[in-house]
Amino acid sequence: MKSRTVIVVGAGPAGMFATRKIASAGYPVVLLNRDVKPGGLAEYGIYPMKTHMKQGLRKQFGKILDLPNVSYFGHMPVGANYAVTIDELQELNPVALVFAVGAQGTKKLGLPGEGCKGIYSAKDFVYHYNLLPPFSGMDFSTGRRIAIIGMGNVMVD
């Protein structure tokens, strides 16, 4: 086993599989994740009733977290405005820092009124029904009529 540690920030699919590859090369890996549970959108972005898909991913991720040279720390956001900064991670002198933080942003269409009350993004809604704080406590009030823009899996869910 190598002596110097690799720090991976983000435990979504990219971070998890990067961790597996790095750990299998013999490096100790410290895996830091903003959310309590690993998985990113694979955990919080899949409709809860799709249990087969979620369970399969959880099983794969569990095997990675069970590797003897992997240490997982959830609820550890990294960045300038958080308890752990990038500078502090660099001070630990890791052999490498890997950032696999995903793309949680919401795309805007540029339509008039899309910022009004009662307009919700799919991301916020999916996080809500997967109970990811702070989205789990959001009130998704609607009027008598609704419109869904898009045709991906979230629309079907």
Feature locations, PLM:
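Rossmann-like nucleotide/phosphate-binding core characteristic of flavoprotein oxidoreductases
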Residues: 1-9, 20-30, 47, 82-93
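FAD-binding core/adjacent interface of flavoenzyme oxidoreductases
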Residues: 2-4, 74-145
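Short amphipathic alpha-helical segments
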Residues: 19-21, 43, 109-113
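Short, well-ordered coil/turn elements that cap or connect secondary structure elements
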Residues: 24, 65-67, 114-116
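Dinucleotide-binding/catalytic capping subdomain of oxidoreductase cores
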Residues: 31-34, 53, 68-69, 116-118, ...
